[in-house]
Amino acid sequence: IGCHVMFYEIDMVEEYLNSVHLALQDIENKENVKVEMMWNLSQYFEECESGEKLFEIKQRINDLENKYGFYSLFYEQNDKPYTMADYRRELNNQCNECDYVIWGESDCLMPRQMFGVLEQLKEHSNQQGIHRFIATFGIRKMWDESWKVLEHPEFTNKPYYSMDTPEDTKLAESSPWSIRYTMSQKEMDEVNAKTSDLDVEMIAYPKFDGSGLIISSDLLRTGANIPPAVYMNGDDSSFLESCRLHMGENYRQYVIRNI
């Protein structure tokens, strides 16, 4: 599992790291999970306010490393851009080292049940002869019906707030089912604690965004990846089309709706 972090995201990323740390607590073979962080300290797009501030950020990274024990990479060139798309393209190339590649994101919380669920999926997919697939966890209420298949059962029948008006903006930022609401680890744990049996649906068409995306390594070995021309927005949608191209009529996506 790998995550690209810009230097100005340093104050928010610990929640993500803590969620991965908690997910690791419930598995025995922790040594088989590689947690990687790409720290982008480049000032190509945005300048750090001072050299002193950049030093503080590096110290903070060191503190987080000592606390959570992840593997760090750094990008520090100021004359050449490096983006999340660049990192995820490289992360996908680690497919020969593992069963899955997972796209972390600095503002995404990973569920505690993640690794246990993935072990179950691996066992099931091997039994069924399904080796190339995507897996996604449940998401909150989205803006149109095309996302309904991915929405968590607790949120799918809730209203969507568009933030077009001050009233809708207030509702969007205060309603737990809204994608604009900042859900805490505790709140996510409470939702997931209600699940006793997994609600897993298989879909035969690609539908996902980039946060928390789980990719089987056998799919990546076919060549599915983010095209080199993509370097800013669109890494998830371009990868979606690459998956569609490489799997064709055999596209498979596990949707774990109630986690």
Where do the protein language model's features map onto the residues?
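Short, well-formed alpha-helical segments that are part of the catalytic scaffolds
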Residues: 9-26, 50-53
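Active-site-proximal specificity loops/subdomain of glycosyltransferases
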Residues: 46-98
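Short beta-strand-to-loop acidic/aromatic patch adjacent to the donor-nucleotide binding site
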Residues: 98-111
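Active-site beta-to-alpha loop of glycosyltransferases that engages the nucleotide-sugar donor
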Residues: 5-18, 43-45, 79-82
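Conserved catalytic core of nucleotide-sugar-dependent glycosyltransferases
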Residues: 92, 111-217, 221
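A short, conserved alpha-helix in the catalytic core of glycosyltransferases
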Residues: 207-208, 212-213, 218-223, 230-257
